[in-house]
Regions:
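Generic structural signal for helix capping and beta-alpha/helix-loop junctions
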Residues: 42-43, 96-98, 120
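Short, hinge-like loop/turn segments at secondary-structure boundaries
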Residues: 50-54, 105-107, 129-130
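A short acidic, glycine-rich active-site loop
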Residues: 54-70
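Short, flexible loop segments at boundaries between secondary-structure elements
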Residues: 137-143
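Structural beta-alpha unit
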Residues: 77-111
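Small/aliphatic-rich secondary-structure junction motif
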Residues: 3-55, 84-87, 134
Length: 143
């Protein structure tokens, strides 16, 4: 049923729970696990810093990419150690649009996303809700 499972992964506790669930799902199905991490734009104050020192923005972005690549490598190792075939991709853009584009491009059969347990007040504006509104594949929300 599910041949390609994609998990949205970042530095959050919720993403760690989503990764664990995605690994558990992928293993018995022998599904390919794709770990996607979105590289979002830097905060606006970097634009001001760029006026004074243009390399500052590029250096900060590269440091962010490097940190996220290291995070992904750790996730791939964790999946591989569990016997799951896994790859990782970094995508640029907004959180929602990046996840949706990656799921379409990689032909994901299932998308797994973590969601805070105590995040009910703004649930209608959550990343999970917005991704659900824009993706064509089934979505599993992990608390």
């Amino acid at each position: 049923m599910f041949h390609t499972i994609m998990v949205a992964y970042d530095e959050s506790r919720e993403a760690a729970h989503a990764l664990a669930s995605a690994i558990e799902l992928a293993k018995p199905l022998r599904a390919h696990l794709i770990i996607v991490t979105v590289v979002e734009a830097l905060p606006a104050f970097y634009n001001i810093a760029a006026i004074v020192s243009p390399p500052v923005v590029e250096e900060a972005l590269e440091e962010k990419r490097s940190r996220l690549r290291t995070l992904q490598q750790s996730a791939v190792k964790r999946a591989t150690a569990a016997g799951v075939n896994a790859d990782a991709i970094l995508v640029d853009g907004g959180e929602v649009s990046g996840i949706v584009r990656a799921a379409q491009r990689e032909h994901a059969d299932l998308l797994v996303i973590g969601h805070p347990k105590h995040y009910r007040l703004g649930a209608f504006n959550s990343t999970v809700r917005n991704v659900a509104d824009h993706t064509r594949c089934p979505l599993l929300e992990v608390n």
